[in-house]
Regions:
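Short beta-edge/loop segments at beta->alpha junctions of small alpha/beta modules
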Residues: 1-74
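Nucleic-acid-binding surface
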Residues: 58-192
Length: 192
């Protein structure tokens, strides 16, 4: 089937999750009922995996973070997911934490996706957010600010590799000098 060939060509190995809109853009010959019929056929034959309504993967090794970003857009991976991955907190978290326009928890293929609501002007400010490999993810500095802003004062196990100038800039430009974040920065830079 030419649809699946076009799909493999378009990914270049980077994209692992596709929305219905992306699938229709890959091959413009497939629209409406023809697209739905092709997707149904590919899912039935095991060439595509249906992750959730309107979202598909080529195989089971898809990126759960990529899916989580696409499932609720705009969103970015942050909080304990980034803090654990970057070694700032040592307790492992199996859930994926993201910030988006609304709070909700979804379980998709056995993985908890926890979306936390944050104001639009903060959500849409790109300072401290890295986009690559089809994933938008906070830097450790942005994740610290996000966590303190949403959850209050926190203890972090390892802040040795934090860029303190970046964290101050994020507090100033994204959080408009939030007092709780500023106090945390002041208390923790004294320890250095």
């Amino acid at each position: 089937m030419s649809f699946i060939k076009d799909l493999y060509k378009s990914t270049n190995g980077n994209q692992t999750v596709f929305s219905l809109v992306e699938l229709s853009n890959i091959n413009p010959d497939y629209v409406g009922p023809k697209l739905n019929s092709a997707i149904k056929y590919l899912v039935k034959n095991g060439d595509l995996i249906r992750l959730s309504k309107g979202f598909y993967a080529l195989n089971r090794t898809y990126s759960i973070q990529e899916f989580a970003n696409k499932y609720r857009s705009p969103s970015y991976v942050s909080l304990y997911t980034v803090l654990f991955e970057s070694g700032i907190v040592f307790q492992p978290y199996t859930s994926i934490y993201l910030l988006s326009k609304r709070s909700e928890t979804k379980i998709i293929n056995g993985v908890n996706l926890i979306y936390k609501n944050i104001k639009n002007d903060i959500l849409l400010n790109s300072l401290g957010i890295i986009s690559g490999n089809n994933i938008s993810k906070a830097t450790p500095e942005r994740a610290i600010c996000d966590t303190i802003y949403l959850l209050g004062g926190q203890y972090f196990d390892n802040t040795r590799n934090i860029d303190w100038e970046l964290i101050k800039q994020i507090n100033q430009d994204v959080y408009t000098n939030n007092k709780i974040i500023a106090r945390w920065i002041q208390e923790n830079t004294k320890l250095i």
